[in-house]
């Protein structure tokens, strides 16, 4: 791949001559000339770029937010001014006894396989700041500002803790589902998503820690692309269990953004263009 760029008035036209094969081959040099009749224009006014050459791919970076050539390989690092957390939850089989908590830690060591490490960590109970579901109807938690719970330079772990108890009913233990979560940052550029329940770059990275794992009380808790479900064993049980869902360590000081993306101007299969 060969890449060249032309910079005009703060914008960047990027051309790429691409080829790939198993054996070496001769290729023509890509050529590109770009010029504009005006290189200094007021904001909001259209600019026409004149283009000549044989570039196979042409992309454009205007220099605007999200379209800046300087951040094409690595995104911006935005200082976080404030953090807020909210989520939605449901509780099925709610007639059976359970206890549910929302906890935060800044000193958990991130070892999800070590129950002792979880018990040793300091967990701040913030349950009372939220509204938890009491039925199978989705319940909005409300929003909590986390500024009083973070420590500069230390990662933040978010945890949902679930306790179930011996049950005589065939219906089994309650199922607590967190089916939406948003950790939001306030920055100088406005509100920005930090983490959610997903498989995208924003994933909060929840891990299930089942205190009954490997025993006859092992839970059926899961983390999927769209929810966290904490649920004890099905059917009658003679013992209870404790299950946690703990997020990855989240940076509370700086928000790393994804790289900026160019606007496509010309593709390999497209005819040559004269203006953009």
Question: Where in this protein do the model-derived segments appear?
Answer:
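Terminal, low-complexity interaction segments
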Residues: 134-189, 236, 244-276
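Non-cytosolic beta-sandwich-type ligand-binding/adhesion modules
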Residues: 91, 95-135, 142
């Amino acid at each position: 791949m060969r890449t060249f760029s032309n910079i005009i008035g703060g914008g960047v036209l990027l051309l790429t001559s691409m080829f790939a094969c198993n054996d070496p081959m001769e290729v023509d040099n890509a050529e590109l000339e770009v010029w504009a009749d005006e290189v200094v224009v007021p904001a909001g006014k259209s600019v026409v770029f004149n283009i000549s050459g044989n570039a196979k791919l042409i992309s454009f970076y205007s220099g605007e937010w999200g379209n800046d050539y300087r951040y094409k390989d690595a995104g911006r690092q935005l200082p976080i001014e404030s953090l807020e957390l909210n989520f939605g939850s449901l509780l099925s089989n709610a007639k059976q006894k359970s206890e549910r908590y929302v906890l935060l830690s800044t000193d958990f060591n991130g070892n999800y396989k070590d129950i002792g490490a979880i018990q040793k960590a300091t967990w701040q109970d913030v349950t009372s700041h939220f509204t938890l579901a009491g039925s199978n109807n989705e319940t909005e938690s409300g929003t909590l500002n986390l500024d009083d719970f973070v420590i500069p330079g230390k990662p933040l772990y978010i945890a949902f803790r679930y306790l179930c108890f011996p049950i005589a009913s065939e219906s089994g233990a309650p199922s607590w589902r967190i089916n939406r979560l948003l950790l939001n940052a306030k920055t100088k550029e406005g509100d920005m998503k930090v983490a959610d329940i997903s498989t995208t770059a924003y994933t909060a990275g929840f891990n299930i820690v089942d205190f009954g794992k490997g025993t006859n009380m092992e839970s059926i808790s899961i983390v999927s692309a769209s929810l966290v479900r904490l649920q004890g064993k099905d059917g009658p049980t003679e013992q209870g269990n404790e299950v946690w869902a703990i997020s990855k360590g989240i940076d509370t000081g700086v928000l790393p953004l994804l790289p900026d993306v160019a606007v496509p101007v010309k593709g390999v299969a497209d005819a040559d263009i004269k203006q953009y």
